[in-house]
């Protein structure tokens, strides 16, 4: 899939913008604080209905307006789709082909994106919540049912934690009802995650071996807070541990086990990647991003859109070449932001170059 056209109204420093793109590489050049990242954020927002930079929607609204409108014309294998998001102080409205979508799970996945931003380099050593978010964003696009089950899980988790914080003593019968619901939704969430990580590992290892010239292997491990011996009995084991932890959870005032506490570990040649070099970290993250692209294509039949936000300068010539070779080979529409073309070691023919200045975007020349 690829974005044919994007229109922004009152989005951050863009008062109004209408732009069309190449189905291949699109490069956005400009000094810092001109709007390059805002532009990629808008594409991300149109796809996932959320920003990767802020939780406060009001920050997305142009300073002298009260509403935001984003519309995009998306070319999918199945045909052209029009996406629209309208944002105001009353909330957000999402539409597909002018039809309002009642649930996020009905909207997300229509346009898939993979974002590679500087903060992704913290994925290995950062907080577990970053790695859970990484899994959730990809799975939500690939399997809309996952978003629904995760939403149900979080709703029951909130109920259980609220009860634990307010209860003066344990009501075992009431907790049993919540435990059953939490284990049911949580087991399905974990099953989806485990399947996803197993599939992602195969793709990521292939890319990592290519980047390292066969010298390194990459493996991934889903680290569950629920102890289980096989995937088929996660529900029973989860339920048992919830019941076993009633007293502990009551005193701590929160739920001590479940997918909300799970993690993801990375290993290079069998060694924990927390102890890898900076160069190995970059190769690992690059391998993951390329694996996300190839796995989405394998599981859905359509390519995602790749957003590279000021990361090319973080990669040496070898890693840049591997990345560009992959997106060209797989026909992935790619958006690259940079302060200078000097940061790009090799640019193939057939790219579209844009200049970004103070919330305006001008095409350099149609196709280079």
Curated annotation (Swiss-Prot):
Entry GO CC: cytoplasm
List of residues binding ATP: 30-37
UniProt entry keywords in alphabetical sequence: ATP-binding, Cytoplasm, DNA damage, DNA repair, DNA replication, DNA-binding, Nucleotide-binding, SOS response
Membrane-spanning intervals of the chain: none
Cystine residue pairs: none
Entries under SUPFAM superfamilies matching the protein: P-loop containing nucleoside triphosphate hydrolases
A single GO molecular function term of this UniProt record: single-stranded DNA binding
Keyword rRNA-binding in annotation: no
Top-level taxon of origin: Bacteria
InterPro entries tied to this protein: DNA-binding_RecF (IPR001238), DNA-binding_RecF_CS (IPR018078), P-loop_NTPase (IPR027417), RecF/RecN/SMC_N (IPR003395), RecF_2 (IPR042174)
Gene Ontology biological process terms in this record: DNA replication; DNA synthesis involved in DNA repair; double-strand break repair; SOS response
Main subcellular localisation: cytoplasm
Keyword Hydrolase: no
Family stated for the protein in its record: Belongs to the RecF family.
Protein role: The RecF protein is involved in DNA metabolism; it is required for DNA replication and normal SOS inducibility. RecF binds preferentially to single-stranded, linear DNA. It also seems to bind ATP.
Alphabetical list of NCBIfam families matching this protein: recf
Listed name of the protein: DNA replication and repair protein RecF
